[in-house]
């Protein structure tokens, strides 16, 4: 190996200016003279290494044209981002000399460099504390922990990342809502209750023993008999973040979270759920992280690794480079994500361009949707705030005027007054224990049952077979007609079905409470027989002249029945006054109200218990007359009844005829058209039978007298009643006048 003089030329200025002399001083001789002992092998090797480095530095630089050509050729041939150190040094010198306004940063990483696009603008002075928080990777770790393990942490408070940062800068209730659930799940259980005022003390006690396991440095806060609360509020926000990060690390080591992670991985959950993977980066220490949380917010982070090597002359092994990390919060909202994506798409790095495309395609649509939802929520809150402001404003300026509140009363005067008014209103109304239709029908059926009067000394007479057969046919329709009559108005409903007297017979007791006065009697009133006899005699004596001229016996029967019709109309007016006014087509009749003294006297003088018969039973029976040839078919049925059972007593047929006749009379009383028709038809018959009027009147008076006398003595005689079902049809009267003869006269003539 040659000496150093052969490798390194002498560049001293004396070589060029001084004249050449003949004497030459050898250079190695003084060295050999000064050396007293040989150099060690390690010293020789170190000296040779230093000489080689100096020789490499002193190499002549190539010409400038050749340098540019070489640089241009290398730029065209570069496919990978990794380049040689010599080329990087040359590019560094050129970039430093060309322009200093390039927005790209060149970071040395070991033996290579990386171009990084600047994405975060310098913050404003007012936003500097928040920017310092966002530059801490511990804050991003805490937010990720809260997002992943939220179901187990039992943190009910909802907050965004910005609100969390505000709470770290200025402590508020959000910090207590986060720390209290975390402290409850960390053993040991403390005796002190965890509240908003005591959680700082519990925090100091629980992190005292575990601090050196999860953090570096000294414990920033200790329990000082309550003074630690003020100390915590005065801490730097970065220290509060470090304390919370240590608390999260302690919490993640608990059994519930570890079992949750193990069970999730066994069920097929990907590991990236618990260990965040980067969304982009290269092999030179630049990594991008994306946090997607619809509740806390979407965030994009960038981590830059810096490795610095100090150029110092050292002996021995190579010195390790000093590696540092720079953490940046690149984007926190929709607008920032749009700006970052545009910058990444314009970058010269292929990795940054691919990340920009990924942001635009996958992340921005979801972020935009969440941004619109939050905007709507903010607008709604703004409208509500405006409404509240308008309510607070003084009357007349904006909003509605305030309404006066009713004075508060702690007594029950108003309540008692309302109850008393309600009681008065209900008392004014007519009490109706049952439906009016039910009440009227029951009263009529009682009247029908009372028509078959029996004394206490005589047994009940048997009912005619034909009448009982008819009544049994209609017994099945009782329930049906009750419900149908409830829904129909009296003026509009159909004729009621016929009922048998045996179904509605009730004995009347002398001690009946409901019949204390005649005003309480509903339906048909049954008067005393003596009173009815006197009233009939008065009517016959007063109307004898008119009856002799007209000879209208049926009109007399209508006058006898006038009292029944008037009572019926009076009851209808009480039960359904409104319905009768709306539906009735006929004018009202003037009602004759019976005197109360007469009713009381007739009821108190002679009241018989049991079934009674009304005086309406003593009516003219048109079955005893014969009609014209066209009317014989209608009367043939009645004649057959008289000769079917001649051995039976005459009272049975009379009772059976009375049942049908009384029922038919009630049907016709309910129908105004039938009633008018009944009044007109007998008049036509009586006008055509003038020759027999005198005899009929005499026999009618005799029959009335005899029947009244028999009822007083308790003897039941033979009676004949009006049966409208056996009347001749209307067409028989239209054909022409027909002579009517009595059955007695016909038998005498025959």
Swiss-Prot record:
Composition bias, Polar residues: 451-471, 688-707
Q: Where is the composition biased (Acidic residues)?
A: 78-100, 545-585
Q: Where is the sequence biased in composition, kind Low complexity?
A: 45-54
Using the UniProt annotation, give all residue ranges assigned to the region (Disordered): 1-125, 450-505, 532-750
Q: Name one GO biological process term.
A: regulation of DNA-templated transcription
Composition bias, Basic and acidic residues: 55-77, 595-606, 741-750
Task: Spell out the disulfide connections.
Answer: none
Q: Which InterPro entries match?
A: DDT_dom, Rsf1-like
Instruction: List the record's Gene Ontology CC terms alphabetically.
Output: ISWI-type complex; RSF complex
Q: Which keywords appear in this protein's UniProt record, sorted alphabetically?
A: Nucleus, Transcription, Transcription regulation
> What region holds the DDT domain?
133-192
* Name of a matching Pfam family: DDT
Task: Decide whether keyword Metal-binding is in the record.
Answer: no
Cellular compartments annotated: Nucleus
- Subunit comment for this entry? Interacts (via the DDT domain) with CHR11 (via C-terminus).
Functionally, this protein is described as follows: Probable transcription regulator.
* Name of the protein in its database record: DDT domain-containing protein DDR4
């Amino acid at each position: 190996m040659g000496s150093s003089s052969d490798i390194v030329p002498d560049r001293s200025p004396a070589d060029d200016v001084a004249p050449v002399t003949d004497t030459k001083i050898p250079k190695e001789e003084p060295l050999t003279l000064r050396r007293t002992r040989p150099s060690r092998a390690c010293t020789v090797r170190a000296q040779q290494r230093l000489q080689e480095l100096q020789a490499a530095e002193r190499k002549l630089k190539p010409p400038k044209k050749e340098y540019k050509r070489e640089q241009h050729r290398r730029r065209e041939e570069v496919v990978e981002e990794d380049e040689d150190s010599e080329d990087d040094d040359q590019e560094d010198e050129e970039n430093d000399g060309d322009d200093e306004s390039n927005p790209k940063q060149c970071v040395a990483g070991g033996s290579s460099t990386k171009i990084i696009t600047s994405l975060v603008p310098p913050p404003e002075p007012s936003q500097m504390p928040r920017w310092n928080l966002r530059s801490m990777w511990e804050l991003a770790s805490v937010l990720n922990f809260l997002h992943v393990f939220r179901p187990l942490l039992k943190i009910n408070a909802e907050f965004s990342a910005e609100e969390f940062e505000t709470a770290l800068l200025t402590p508020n209730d959000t910090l207590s809502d986060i720390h209290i659930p975390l402290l409850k799940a960390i053993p040991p259980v403390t005796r002190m209750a965890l509240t908003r005022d005591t959680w700082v003390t519990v925090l100091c006690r629980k992190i005292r023993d575990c601090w050196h396991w999860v953090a570096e440095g000294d414990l920033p806060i200790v329990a000082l008999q309550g003074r630690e609360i003020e100390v915590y509020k005065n801490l730097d926000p970065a220290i509060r973040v470090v304390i919370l990060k240590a608390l999260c690390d302690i919490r993640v080591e608990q059994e519930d979270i570890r079992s949750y992670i193990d069970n999730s991985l066994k069920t097929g959950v990907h590991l990236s759920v618990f260990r965040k993977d980067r969304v982009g980066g290269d092999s030179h220490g630049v990594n991008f992280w994306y946090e997607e949380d619809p509740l806390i917010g979407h965030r994009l982070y960038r981590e830059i690794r810096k490795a610095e090597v100090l150029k110092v002359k050292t002996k021995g092994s190579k010195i390790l480079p000093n590696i540092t990390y720079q953490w940046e919060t690149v984007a926190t909202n929709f607008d920032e994500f749009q700006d970052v994506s545009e910058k990444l798409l314009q970058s010269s790095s292929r990795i940054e361009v691919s990340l920009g495309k990924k942001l635009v395609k996958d992340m921005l649509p979801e972020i935009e949707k969440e941004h619109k939802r939050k905007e709507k929520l903010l607008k709604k809150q703004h409208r509500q705030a405006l409404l509240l402001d308008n309510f607070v404003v003084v009357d007349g300026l904006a909003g509605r005027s305030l309404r006066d509140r009713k004075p508060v009363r702690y007594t029950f005067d108003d309540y008692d007054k309302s109850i008393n008014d309600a009681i008065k209103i209900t008392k004014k109304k007519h009490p109706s224990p049952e439906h009016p239709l039910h009440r009227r029908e029951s009263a009529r059926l009682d009247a029908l049952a009372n028509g078959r009067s029996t004394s206490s000394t005589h047994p009940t007479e048997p009912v005619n077979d034909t009448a009982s057969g008819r009544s049994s046919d209609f017994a099945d329709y009782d329930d049906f007609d009750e419900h149908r009559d409830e829904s129909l108005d009296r003026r509009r409903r159909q004729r009621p079905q016929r009922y048998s007297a045996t179904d509605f017979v009730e004995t009347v007791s002398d001690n009946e409470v409901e019949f204390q006065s005649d005003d309480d009697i509903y339906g048909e009133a049954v008067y005393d027989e003596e009173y009815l006899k006197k009233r009939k005699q008065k009517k016959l004596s007063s109307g004898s002249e008119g009856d002799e001229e007209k000879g209208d016996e049926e009109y007399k029967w209508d006058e006898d029945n006038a009292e029944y019709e008037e009572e019926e109309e009076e009851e209808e007016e009480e039960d359904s006054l409104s319905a009768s006014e709306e539906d009735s087509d006929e004018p009202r009749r003037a009602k004759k109200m019976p005197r109360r003294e007469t009713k009381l006297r007739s009821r108190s003088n002679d009241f018989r218990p049991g079934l009674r018969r009304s005086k309406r039973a003593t009516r003219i029976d048109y079955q005893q007359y014969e009609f014209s040839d066209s009317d014989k078919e209608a009367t043939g049925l009645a004649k057959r009844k008289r000769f079917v059972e001649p051995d039976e007593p005459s009272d049975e047929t009379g009772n059976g005829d009375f049942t049908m006749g009384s029922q038919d009379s009630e049907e016709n009383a309910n129908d105004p058209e039938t009633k008018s028709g009944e009044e007109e038809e007998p008049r036509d018959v009586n006008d055509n039978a003038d020759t027999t009027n005198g005899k009929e009147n005499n026999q009618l008076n005799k029959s009335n007298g005899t029947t009244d006398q028999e009822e007083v003595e308790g003897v039941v005689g033979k009676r004949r009643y009006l049966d409208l079902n056996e009347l001749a049809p209307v067409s028989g009267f239209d054909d022409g006048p027909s002579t009517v003869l009595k059955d007695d006269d016909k038998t005498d003539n025959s």
